[in-house]
């Protein structure tokens, strides 16, 4: 049977992952019983694999076999650094605003909206959503190029002179830009929560602007029609702009009427006030006398003009055009239009978006008997307008959901040696995320950094330096490991520990086959491809395992890379992008 896993499902999973870094565990009685097991204190970025791939320029694709995900990645692990909620963000593909480029206009009918270029980031790190472009088709297709960069951080729709309409969504802070912006992705977040601010630090900051947008969007309600796409402009419509003459009352007044050559030719058209106390209001024309230029507007039972709260004043400006009727399952949307000198619709204004529409359509109404009397006026050729229903909550209410934020980025900065937990004398080829690792005593790990190499303090060294990546073997145990580094001529750090299955003696950890505290640990001789270095483990306590119990956590993500060489004066800024 046909089925669909929606983008909302993907975004839900991504949000659950991000929100898990702030979750709190409770017992059935509502008391916090174990904060050590929380995800925000128990997710680590790890590095690993000192040995080369078969081709270091083309690392192999990781597999999800248990042998690899659960075992090999742990054996290769060198060190790990904790990821906190401040190190995680939703991200979306980066789309820089570029002059003379076409952008897709949002439409509720587009099945694969996140794949379209319908939002941009400007050089001020402002993110805008494209709601309309000049000559937008009903499907939102790119019909013209954007030549005016959107600017501003207000809550209203931004209309630029090239015909585009944009909605400001949010601004990326300098701190977030440094941490989460990459050549291919930018961060996205929703700052408002049910109980108000996510944090109380938004006044005058980029977060305040986004909060204002989210609040304004919420006040418009669900299913508002904030934009109308003009598909075909039609022809032979009557309309004009001008200033009112004498006012009789709220429903009767004199207009310019320069282009209206006969009685009632504009009956059923709308008049819309563009200045004065009635600005933004308007009504439907029911009578027009050409000789006196007097129009009459429909009234209610009390004689008050429908659509006006009072009488306009002489010299107030107006626009007359075809009446726009919106049909659908919502309410209160109000749209007006104007026409050009050729009788085609040249602009559409949304006076009120209404709410609760899930579907809507537009009918353009004008007097269809314009040629009934002399002089003849051609009947209009119908225009096609498409009302665009906004997302749940309104444009800007939830940027993560609206822009397809089903990608999550984690960021970790490996600074120098990280208190000697991270080697600066070797490279690595794996980075990944491990959740819920534990210490040897069974507690969940909480340290900010952990050293996962096995450390051996040596004596009786033969003077030959152990070489990074080479294989060493315990003379008694038969256990093998790979050299991470050799420190101060007396400390060997190893990874990829493989105990011997033939050993009959317990190792340092009480398990047969592991390195023991007093055995000789030697590299192969030079003739067999090794350095020939050799030394003896320095008795009791000289061998210690990594800080984390191997195989105790879940490897959630792994990425194979070409070698990354570390140095004592170097910082690695590691960003992992996960798609849900």
PLM region spans:
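Extended assembly-interface regions of large multimeric machines
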Residues: 1-125, 131-138, 146-195, 199, ...
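Short, surface-exposed terminal/edge motifs of secreted or surface/virion proteins that either
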Residues: 126-129, 133, 293-299
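Conserved, function-critical positions that sit in or immediately flank catalytic
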Residues: 162-580
């Amino acid at each position: 049977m046909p089925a669909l896993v929606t983008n909302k499902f993907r975004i839900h999973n991504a949000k659950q992952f991000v929100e898990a870094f702030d979750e709190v565990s409770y017992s059935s009685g509502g008391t916090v019983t174990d904060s050590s097991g929380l995800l925000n204190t128990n997710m680590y970025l790890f590095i690993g694999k000192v040995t080369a791939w078969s081709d270091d320029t083309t690392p192999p694709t990781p597999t999800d076999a248990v042998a690899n995900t659960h075992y090999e990645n742990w054996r290769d692990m060198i060190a790990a650094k904790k990821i906190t909620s401040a190190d995680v963000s939703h991200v979306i593909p980066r789309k820089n605003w570029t002059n003379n480029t076409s952008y897709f206009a949002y439409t509720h009918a587009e099945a694969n909206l996140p794949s379209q270029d319908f939002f941009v980031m400007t050089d001020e790190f402002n993110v805008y959503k494209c709601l309309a472009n000049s000559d937008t088709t009903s499907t939102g297709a790119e019909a013209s190029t954007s030549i005016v960069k959107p600017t501003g951080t207000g809550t209203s729709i931004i209309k630029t002179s090239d015909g585009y309409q944009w909605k400001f969504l949010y601004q990326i802070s300098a701190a977030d830009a440094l941490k989460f912006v990459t050549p291919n992705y930018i961060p996205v977040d929703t700052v408002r929560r049910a109980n108000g601010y996510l944090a109380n630090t938004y006044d005058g900051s980029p977060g305040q602007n986004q909060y204002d947008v989210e609040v304004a969007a919420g006040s418009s309600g669900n299913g508002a029609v904030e934009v109308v796409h003009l598909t075909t402009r039609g022809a032979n419509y009557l309309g004009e702009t001008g200033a009112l003459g004498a006012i009789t009352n709220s429903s009767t007044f004199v207009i310019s009427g320069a282009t209206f050559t006969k009685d009632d030719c504009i009956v059923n058209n709308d008049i819309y006030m563009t200045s004065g106390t009635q600005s933004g209001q308007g009504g439907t024309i029911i009578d027009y006398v050409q000789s006196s230029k007097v129009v009459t507007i429909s009234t209610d039972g009390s004689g008050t003009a429908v659509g006006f709260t009072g009488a306009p004043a002489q010299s107030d400006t107006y626009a007359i055009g075809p009446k726009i009727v919106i049909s659908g399952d919502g309410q209160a949307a109000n749209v007006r239009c104007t026409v050009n000198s050729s009788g085609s619709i040249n602009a559409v204004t949304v006076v009120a978006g209404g709410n609760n529409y899930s579907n809507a359509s537009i009918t353009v109404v004008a007097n269809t008997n314009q040629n009934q009397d002399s002089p003849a006026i051609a009947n209009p050729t119908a225009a096609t307008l498409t009302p665009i229903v906004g997302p749940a909550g309104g444009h800007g209410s939830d940027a993560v959901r609206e822009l397809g934020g089903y990608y999550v980025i984690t960021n970790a900065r490996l600074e120098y040696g990280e208190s000697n937990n991270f080697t600066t004398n070797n490279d690595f080829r794996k980075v990944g995320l491990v959740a819920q690792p534990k210490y040897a005593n069974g507690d969940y790990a909480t340290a900010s950094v952990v050293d996962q190499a096995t450390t051996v303090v040596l004596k009786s060294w033969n003077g030959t330096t152990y070489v990074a990546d080479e294989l060493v073997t315990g003379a008694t145990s038969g256990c093998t490991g790979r050299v991470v580094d050799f420190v101060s001529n007396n400390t060997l750090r190893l990874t990829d520990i493989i105990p011997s299955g033939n050993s009959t003696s317990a190792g340092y950890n009480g398990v047969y086959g592991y390195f023991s505290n007093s055995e000789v640990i030697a590299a192969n001789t030079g003739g067999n491809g090794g350095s020939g270095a050799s030394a003896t483990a320095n008795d009791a306590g000289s061998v210690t395992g990594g800080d984390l119990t191997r195989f105790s956590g879940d490897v959630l993500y792994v990425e194979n890379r070409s070698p990354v060489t570390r140095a004592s004066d170097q910082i690695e800024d590691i960003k992992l992008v996960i798609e849900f």
